[in-house]
Amino acid sequence: MKKELYIGLDVHREAVAIAVAEQGRKGEVRDYGQISNDLHALERFITRLRQTHGKRVTLRACYEAGPCGFGVARRLQQLGVECAVVAPSLTPTRAGDRLKTDKRDARKLARLLRAGELSAIYIPEPTDEAIRDLCRARSDAVDDRRRSRNRLKAFLLRHGYRCQESERGKHQELFH
């Protein structure tokens, strides 16, 4: 039987907390520690894990979706690791788990991945993600423009300048 290891990652901007769970219900969940959040450190970690447990070991990893995006998942998949990204809102929690630390989160993810209790989200292709980012940036710019225009109108109104009904369509001249 092939050996399987389940890796829980708590990914942040600067560092990644790692826990590794061995297969089997009674398999131990060990804290690996923290590595810096860069792709070379991640590659060194996977290489070291394979050297320790043998090249035939199956590695499965997961982390919660967040602002760091899908780069970690894509790199792990390139290295031959099955990687799942899970929505934090769909991660089961126990009633007493109030204290959150990076180490505990990594351990919990490794344990839940081994138990099969996590549901992965779709990891978009880089081109799809780029289009999504561009659409979000445009939407943010449109919202910022509207808010700025409303702030300026409120400022002018506070200082006695009223916008007449017939002039409302001419605001383009003021703001461009």
Functional labels for PLM-detected ranges:
Residues 13, 67, 90:
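Short, glycine/acidic-enriched loop or turn micro-motifs at the edges of active sites
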